[in-house]
Amino acid sequence: MLEVKNLCKKFNNRSILKDISFTLKDGEIMTIVGPSGAGKTTLLRIIAGLETKDSGEILIDGKPYDPGNVGVVFQDFNLFPNLNVLQNITLAPTMVLKESKAEAEQNAQKLLDQLQMNGREKQYPYQLSGGQKQRVAIARALAMNPRILCYDEPTSALDPNLRKEVEKMIWDLKKSGLTQLIITHDLTFAKNVADQMLKVQPLSEA
């Protein structure tokens, strides 16, 4: 279970997040919605360990959490253009988790099969559609065995017709027991996938 308690963040003395609190149970999906400037992506970056908080607590199962337990699927996917699909997925497990190449490739293949991307192992990012790049980015994040998977605007870079496909993929991952946190401005999508929704608004005070 992920708990965020009274999280605050300022940039240049301007409050971006103030006293944000929520609880996300294991296996649930939370969407965080709000307009641009509301601090949604900043909140995700703090939870993922990519940004520091000014105050507040982040706990997993009641204990201070390790950002290594959190995977992120970035809005523009951030795939390495010079690596093929399989290499993109296996790079971090071999370097960070010290998995053998064979083990990392076996796990990557399972993830690609799960995400219906088998047969594309040797392709490069430029050969993939936006939806396919997203699936590779998800597989890459899952290869690190995260407790929680975060998405930054998962529908924004895709054709609107693919929204239902993304919804199904997120629900399929939920069935496997994965806890998911989704930043989005797409209210319809947010309502369709969420067990719970957190609405954030821009803060006007300095």
PLM segments and residue spans:
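The feature captures the beta-strand-to-loop junction immediately N-terminal to the Walker
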Residues: 33-35
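Helix-to-loop junction immediately C-terminal to a conserved catalytic motif
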Residues: 48
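Conserved ABC transporter NBD signature motif
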Residues: 56-68
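Conserved signature/switch motifs of ABC ATPase nucleotide-binding domains
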Residues: 123-126, 144, 176
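Hydrophobic anchor residue at the start of the ABC signature
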Residues: 138
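Catalytic Walker B motif of ABC-type/P-loop ATPase nucleotide-binding domains
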Residues: 149-152
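Helix N-cap at the start of a conserved alpha-helix in ABC-type nucleotide-binding domains
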Residues: 160-162
